[in-house]
Amino acid sequence: LALEIPIECLNSDGDGIIGAWTTASLPQAEIEDPSPTYEQPSFYGGAYVQQSRLSAPLVNELVIGLPDKDLFNAAEPTQDGALAQYVTNPSLPYLLDVLFRNPVNSTLGPDIANLAPTNLPRQDLITAFLTGFPGLNSPANVVPSEMMRLNMGVPATPRDEQSTFGVVDEDLAGFPNGRRPGDDTVDIALRVVMGALCHPVPLGAELGVDGAVEETDSDLINLGLCDPQDAAGGTVPFTDGAPISASELKDVFPYLNDPIAGSPNN
């Protein structure tokens, strides 16, 4: 599904920041038809029950623990406080450390003893996934909850000028301030989970920091969420090896390219 909605239809309270998520639901009951047909082997009825939920990518797949994945799928964002420990104390960084510490050290040269960030609880991940960034896409009186937040007041970046790394690469119109088709959300999420926000980021001028000048050292700021020593692997360019770029996509709504056609013989 792709919807194009005027901003004025979404900005009811005037602060310009929205949060969104999608859900899928199925009827509560399935009854086997004693005289089934190919088209209808069963009957469905009862209230619709939420089966899945999605906003930011990979949250349920990689952040929420196995015992609570079904609970997350059935929950509303107002219930996310019960699942916050998966964000504040995630297991994914430890898994990535086990899998990739030796390759990182042998490829990049450093002798990192542990790739996993040590700043527990992870305030940087609470900001990235549950509240949004102050001054960018965090609304007033925000309640920590997992949703895709967007500051509609940030001008859209022209397609040819977009950075696939979004906010962390000085493109405030990109992920996690919303999500564009050309944002490399997997690479961004990997780097944030491994502590990229503990290191200085070139956002001083973009966020209006006094004295910050674009393309100078003054543009590098610490967001105050954690410190570089908390994340030895925070500058490692983690990637899934599947790059994407807005220039590969259409420049008109809905922007996504047509799917590759399947075999005509199937």
Question: Which positions does each model-derived feature cover?
Answer:
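Surface-exposed extracytoplasmic segments
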Residues: 1-266
